[in-house]
C-alpha cells in the first residue's frame, strides 16, 4: 500500500526524512508513534510503508499541526493533541504499553512554526512575542519577560541558550520593561523589538549568526519546557517500546543532543558494577535496556544546501532490549 503522493509535497523540507524512518526498521504490521507530527512528513512516509494491519499514532501539542493531521483519512492513523511527554498515558489508554515497535521524535521548533510570524518564534519576522507551541496553554514569552527577574532571566539565557552575554542581555530586557512601566510606554511585545534590543546590547561579530539566536532559543525552550518534556519521553519510551522496538530521535541543538546521547549511552551500558567484586562476567546483571544502533547521522551537504535549517541536525537511533 503506497501513499507516495501524500508526502511528496513535504519531503523536501523534512530533515533526514528517510534516514529517520529507516532507523525505525519498520515492520509492515507494526505499531508506531510519531511524537512530533509537525506537517506530517515522517508520518506520511511511515504510512506508505505499513500494511493494512499496521498502525501509526501521531502526537503534537500544536493545534495547527493537529488540524493538518486530521486531514489524513486513513483507518491506520490516529492523532493526539498532546505533548509527547504523555506518551505513556497515551499508550495506557489504548492497551499498548510494551507493544510499540518504534518511536520517532523530531525535536525543536518546526519550519511552519518558524515561518509563521504570528507564532513569535522568529527574530527575522515581526510578530507577537509568543513562542508557545500550544498557544491555548501557559503564558506567552512577552508576558513572562514582563515578570521575570534579571537573575532568573540570565539563568535561562545561559542554561538553555548557552549565551555568553546572558547577564548583559537580561539586564537590557528587564530595564526596558521597567522603563516602560515608569514612562507608560509599551513593553517588549514584538519579536523584532526584542531582536533589535539584543542586537544593540551585544557585539555583532558572527556575520552568519544573528546575535538574538541563542536568546530566542533559550526563551522558547523555557516557555515550552522542552528539555523537561524530552527527559520524560525518553524515560517513558523504555516502558512503551516492545522488545527490539526502535527509538529514532533528531535533535537540532547541543543541549538536546547531549541529553539524547547521554540517555542512550547510559541505558546501553546498564548499571555500573563496583570494581573488585568477586563475580564472573556471566554473574553480572547490568540491566542494559537499550542498544545504540550505529553512529550519529548528520545531513549531507546536498541536503543542507537544499534546506539550510538542516545544518545542525543530528539523528541518533537505539533499540529496546528484552
Curated annotation (Swiss-Prot):
It is found in: Cytoplasm. It holds the Pfam family Methyltransf_5. Keywords: Cytoplasm, Methyltransferase, rRNA processing, S-adenosyl-L-methionine, Transferase. It comes from the Bacteria. Coiled coil: none annotated. One of its GO terms (biological process) is rRNA base methylation. GO terms for cellular component: cytoplasm. Its EC number is 2.1.1.199. This is Ribosomal RNA small subunit methyltransferase H.
Amino acid at each position: 500500500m503506497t501513499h507516495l503522493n501524500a508526502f511528496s509535497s513535504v519531503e523536501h523540507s523534512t530533515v533526514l526524512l528517510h534516514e529517520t524512518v529507516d532507523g525505525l526498521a519498520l515492520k509492515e504490521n507494526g505499531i508506531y508513534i510519531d511524537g512530533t507530527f509537525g506537517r506530517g512528513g515522517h508520518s506520511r512516509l511511515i504510512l506508505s510503508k505499513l500494511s493494512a494491519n499496521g498502525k501509526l499514532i501521531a502526537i503534537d501539542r500544536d493545534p495547527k499541526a493537529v488540524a493538518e493531521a486530521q486531514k489524513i483519512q486513513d483507518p491506520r492513523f490516529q492523532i493526539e493533541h498532546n505533548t509527547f511527554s504523555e506518551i505513556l498515558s497515551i499508550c495506557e489508554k489504548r492497551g499498548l504499553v510494551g507493544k510499540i515497535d518504534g518511536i520517532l521524535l523530531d525535536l525543536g521548533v518546526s519550519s511552519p512554526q518558524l515561518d509563521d510570524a504570528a507564532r513569535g518564534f522568529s527574530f527575522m519576522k515581526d510578530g507577537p512575542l509568543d513562542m508557545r507551541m500550544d498557544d491555548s496553554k501557559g503564558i506567552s514569552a512577552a508576558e513572562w519577560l514582563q515578570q521575570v527577574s534579571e537573575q532568573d532571566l540570565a539563568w535561562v539565557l545561559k542554561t538553555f541558550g548557552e549565551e555568553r552575554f546572558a547577564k548583559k542581555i537580561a539586564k537590557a530586557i528587564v530595564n526596558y520593561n521597567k522603563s516602560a512601566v515608569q514612562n507608560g510606554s509599551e513593553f517588549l511585545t514584538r519579536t523584532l523589538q526584542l531582536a533589535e534590543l539584543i542586537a544593540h546590547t551585544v557585539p555583532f561579530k558572527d556575520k552568519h549568526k544573528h546575535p538574538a539566536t541563542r536568546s530566542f532559543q533559550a526563551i522558547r525552550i523555557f516557555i515550552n519546557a522542552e528539555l523537561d518534556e524530552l527527559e520524560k519521553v525518553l524515560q517513558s519510551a523504555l516502558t512503551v517500546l516492545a522488545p527490539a522496538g526502535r527509538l529514532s530521535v533528531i535533535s537540532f541543538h547541543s543541549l538536546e543532543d547531549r541529553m539524547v546521547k547521554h540517555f542512550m549511552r547510559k541505558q546501553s551500558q546498564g548499571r555500573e558494577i563496583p570494581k573488585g567484586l568477586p563475580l564472573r562476567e556471566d554473574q553480572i546483571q547490568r540491566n542494559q535496556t537499550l542498544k545504540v544502533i550505529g553512529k550519529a547521522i548528520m545531513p549531507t551537504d546536498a541536503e543542507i544546501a537544499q534546506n539550510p535549517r538542516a545544518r545542525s541536525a543530528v539523528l541518533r537511533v537505539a533499540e529496546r532490549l528484552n
